[in-house]
Design a protein with these regions (language model features):
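Surface loop/turn motifs at the tips and blade-to-blade linkers of beta-strand repeat domains
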Residues: 16-20, 63-64, 77-80, 134-136, ...
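Short coil/turn segments that connect the beta-strands within blades of beta-propeller domains
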Residues: 36-37, 93-95, 155-157, 212, ...
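Conserved beta-strand element within WD40/beta-propeller blades
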Residues: 1, 39-43, 97-101, 160-161, ...
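A structural motif specific to WD40 beta-propellers
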Residues: 9-15, 59-61, 117-119, 187-192, ...
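Surface-exposed loop and turn segments in beta-propeller and other repeat-based domains
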Residues: 64-76, 120-134, 192-199, 248-254
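Canonical WD40 repeat/beta-propeller blade segments in eukaryotic WD-repeat proteins
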Residues: 20-31, 70-89, 138-147, 199-210, ...
């Protein structure tokens, strides 16, 4: 027999762990043309897993776009507290990335065919708890962003993710992970893990546009956090044995402005300016020298929470904030040229 999610202790029971999601139903697929019998498990994320009856190993998976299987087992009082879900696009590959059947896993979806491409586990974790134990608090992927593709590349070179969990073993868990595209394995491989990149959570993550053909200087990464800091991260290298070189990411700079909380960050199209939405202001910084170039504010915005460059060559900057208002500045004249509210 195949048992999943049943307490151990009875003779004759065999287990197939980590199928990916809670089991909804089971069926038996009879063998044909001298093939062995298989078990078919329909999972709560919408996928179907075939398990060989002799080896009890999964042989293949059929899946469309997966749904969040944790909703089916989460307590009712948690359904209303749904946080924003990460959503990103690798435009070079034509892939949309969103949460998969488990909060610690993302799925890649082909935007042209609207079909499931593959899953990628960002943080290894147990999917299902024992019946006599409390439901596990999963590590959740909070943010996913991609760098711009290098010249003639079919995929973004870098992917950054933020994952975490409230009240982990001893304290809140939070990790910034940098993944690099590996053309041999056709997937992203973990390059750098940075625990607690900010002391009080991460509010935004953004890659710069491509700044150089040199891989070491091609990109910067900007993050903002609940600790009031704006940080930039860069690629570094070190020599290994055998004349090999390893690339990794480290913190390049950290700065703040008037103890205001930064909510969002945006890069100018040419990478020459870094805009930060924080409190009453949108501040503009030179990312190389960290000298503030301008401070934009208007009485119409009480708290700016989002900003981005727009227009030809990023001449204009759009900002949204409370009370539900969109404002656009001309950066040449540093004046408001358009404003609209809900």
């Amino acid at each position: 027999k195949m048992h999943s999610g049943t307490a151990a202790g009875s003779d004759g029971r065999e287990f197939v762990p980590r199928l990916g999601a809670p089991i909804v139903s089971l069926a038996v697929a009879s063998g044909y043309e001298n093939t062995e019998q298989e078990y078919v498990a329909r999972l709560a994320d919408g996928s179907a897993v075939f398990v060989a009856s002799l080896s009890l190993k999964p042989t293949r998976v059929f899946s469309t776009i997966k749904c969040d299987a944790m909703r089916a087992i989460a307590p009712e009082n948690t359904h209303a507290n749904v946080s924003p879900q990460p959503l990103a696009a690798d435009l070079a590959a034509g892939h949309l990335v969103l949460l998969s059947g488990h909060p610690s896993t993302v799925q890649f979806v082909d935007m042209a065919t609207q079909s499931h491409v593959h899953d990628m586990e960002i943080a290894p974790s147990n999917r299902v708890s024992r019946p006599d134990e409390a439901i596990l608090t999963p590590i959740t992927v909070c943010n996913v962003v991609f760098s711009a593709p290098l010249r003639d590349a079919m995929h973004a070179e870098w992917m950054a993710t933020i994952d975490g969990r409230e009240g982990g073993s001893f304290t809140t868990e939070l990790s910034l992970k940098l993944w690099q595209w590996d053309s041999r394995s056709k997937t992203y491989v973990l390059n750098t893990r940075i625990d607690h990149p900010h002391n009080k959570g991460v509010t935004c993550v953004r890659f710069s546009p491509c700044l150089s053909e040199d891989p070491l200087n091609a990109f910067l990464l900007a993050t903002t956090g609940g600790d009031g800091q704006v940080k930039t991260w860069r690629i570094a290298s070190r020599s290994l044995k055998g004349a090999r070189t390893e690339h990794f990411w480290l913190c390049r700079s950290s700065f703040s402005y008037r103890e205001s909380l930064p909510h969002h960050v945006a890069w100018a199209p040419d990478g020459s300016l870094l805009a930060v939405a924080q409190g009453l202001f949108v501040t503009l910084w030179d990312p190389q020298t960290l000298v503030m170039q301008a401070r934009l504010a208007t009485p119409e915005l009480k708290d700016v929470h989002t900003c981005d460059f727009c227009g030809r060559k990023g001449r204009y900057l759009a900002a949204m904030g409370s009370p539900s208002r969109l404002v656009i500045w001309d950066l040449v004249s540093q004046s408001v040229v358009w404003s609209v509210s809900d």
